[in-house]
Design a protein with these regions (language model features):
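Transmembrane beta-strand segments of Gram-negative outer membrane beta-barrel proteins
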Residues: 23-65, 74-85, 167-171
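Short loop/turn motifs that connect adjacent beta-strands in outer-membrane beta-barrel proteins
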Residues: 23-29, 71-82, 94, 107-111, ...
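Membrane-embedded beta-strand positions of outer-membrane beta-barrel proteins
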Residues: 30-34, 83-85, 115, 167-169, ...
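Transmembrane beta-strands of outer-membrane beta-barrel pores
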Residues: 34-42, 71-73, 87-91, 108-110, ...
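Residues that define the transmembrane beta-barrel architecture of outer-membrane proteins
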Residues: 57-65, 96-100, 139-149, 193-199, ...
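Residues on the lipid-exposed face of transmembrane beta-strands in outer-membrane beta-barrel proteins
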Residues: 65-71, 102-108, 115, 146-152, ...
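Internal, well-ordered domain-core segments that constitute the primary functional module
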Residues: 121-232
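Outer-membrane beta-barrel pore domains
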Residues: 258-415
Length: 415
């Protein structure tokens, strides 16, 4: 009987979070949170790991204690500042102690500069219910960076409040080199001192006083560059990171003689990105939004030639009229099996024609992959390298077809 009860208990998941939050004057607040997960099987249940900003563990029977202090921006002032410090002690995580967030933000009117490691959300999607964006989701630990941005939509001049813009430019550094070295254990490549770059631009056409329709368009691009790549045979590939290379990453271009042969032929670094679009309609008591995102690894994925409609994340978000059951419903379809075609080929004297394909999403020949601390930075439905048993930091299952549904609500005021 005891064995049977233990089996039933271990097959069920027990998630026991407890949090204390308090707020002081001028936006200063703190939080203390603890969580424990007990489960059967080999790993923690997927949705207790994914989209937690890396504050989770795939190892079953894990726990953490999280404490943080934050100051929020004062949005009613032209100039404001914010900061945050969040530290975690954990059991059966990739680290026993780590800093989850440490940042300072300065904002003047609509412009902001942010320095440090900060959790950020998805673009055009519901952070609570979406499976996650293709380039940047909420799945991995924050990357420390210096980020200059227009973080929220602001009206573009002379458009009578119809046109709105936002965007950012950032440079930073990955912090998981010791984890990579431990995880690979000499079985596959890993990198040290890898640098990070991202940029994005978004445009929204909306004036709800005159029309219930809104349209959003955007592009996000990111790159890994610099650092050293260590191979199992002892080879070390050192990649350039001069000031000129920072510009080569911002304006994607070939590497110079100090770069690898591949980066001299192609583009310096590992580049990823996505196009996004959304159309919304606001009814008097509810609203609906359809969105689309296409991921790309290189030029073949960026052009219309290879069918941007084939590999994409499409979704529908419905915010319902006030009711005691369901507030918001999100449905999504993800497809990544095309990848610009079956193979990649450069023209030769024998065959004077090039074929671009086999994009191998989230992977790269020099860098570990589009991951941080083993968790994919993009959509978590593409299985993260931390699940690999062979010490490989590549995304081994990146051709995916999946459906996702999420909903939230407040059926009782007691919750």
């Amino acid at each position: 009987m005891k064995r049977r009860n233990y089996f039933i208990f271990s097959c069920l998941m027990l998630m026991a979070p407890a949090a204390v939050q308090a707020q002081f004057d001028k936006g200063l607040n703190y939080k203390i949170e603890t969580s424990a997960t007990v489960s059967g099987g080999h790993n923690t249940p997927f949705w207790l790991v994914a989209n937690k900003h890396g504050l989770s563990s795939i190892r079953k029977n894990n726990a953490y204690l999280d404490a943080g202090i934050f100051r929020d921006l004062e949005k009613d002032k032209k100039f404001s500042y914010a900061f945050g410090l969040e530290m975690v002690g954990a059991s059966r995580f990739t680290s026993k102690f780590f800093i989850q967030q440490a940042y300072v933000d300065l904002r003047y009117r609509g412009m902001e500069i942010s320095v440090g490691s900060k959790e950020r959300g998805n673009e055009m999607k519901n952070d609570q219910l979406s499976s996650g964006s293709m380039t940047f989701s909420t799945n991995a630990r924050p990357i420390p960076q210096v980020r200059v941005s227009i973080p929220e939509y602001i009206p573009f001049p002379w458009t009578k409040n119809w046109l709105h813009i936002k965007g950012h430019v950032a440079y930073g550094m990955f912090t998981d080199e010791k984890f990579q070295e431990r995880f690979t254990a000499g079985r596959s490549k890993y990198t040290k001192e890898t640098l990070f770059h991202s940029k994005a631009a978004f445009l929204k056409v909306e004036n709800l006083q005159k029309s219930p329709v809104s349209v959003e368009l955007g592009i996000e691009m990111a790159a890994q560059f610099g650092g050293d790549c260590y191979y199992p045979d002892g080879t070390v590939l050192r990649t350039p990171d001069s000031w000129k290379d920072f510009f080569r990453i911002f304006f994607p271009s070939n590497g110079d003689s100090g770069a690898s042969e591949s980066d001299q032929i192609n583009i310096l670094g590992n580049h990823v990105g996505s196009y996004s679009a959304a159309v919304g309609y606001h009814f008097p008591t509810w609203k609906i939004k359809a969105y689309w995102e296409h991921f790309f690894e290189d030029r073949s994925g960026m052009t219309l030639t290879y069918g941007m409609w084939r590999d994409c994340l499409t979704g529908l978000e419905v915010t319902l009229p006030e009711n005691p059951f369901v507030k918001t419903i999100v449905g999504e379809f993800l497809y990544t099996k095309h990848q610009s075609g079956a193979f990649h080929y450069f023209a030769t004297p024998a065959i004077d024609h090039s074929f671009t394909g086999a994009d191998n999403y989230y992977n790269n020949s020099q860098y570990a992959g589009w991951e941080h601390w083993g968790q994919g930075i993009g959509n978590p439905l593409v299985t993260s390298p931390i699940y690999n048993k062979d010490g490989n930091l590549a995304f081994e299952s990146n051709r995916v077809k999946g459906f996702h549904i999420g909903l939230n609500g407040k059926p009782t005021t007691e919750i």
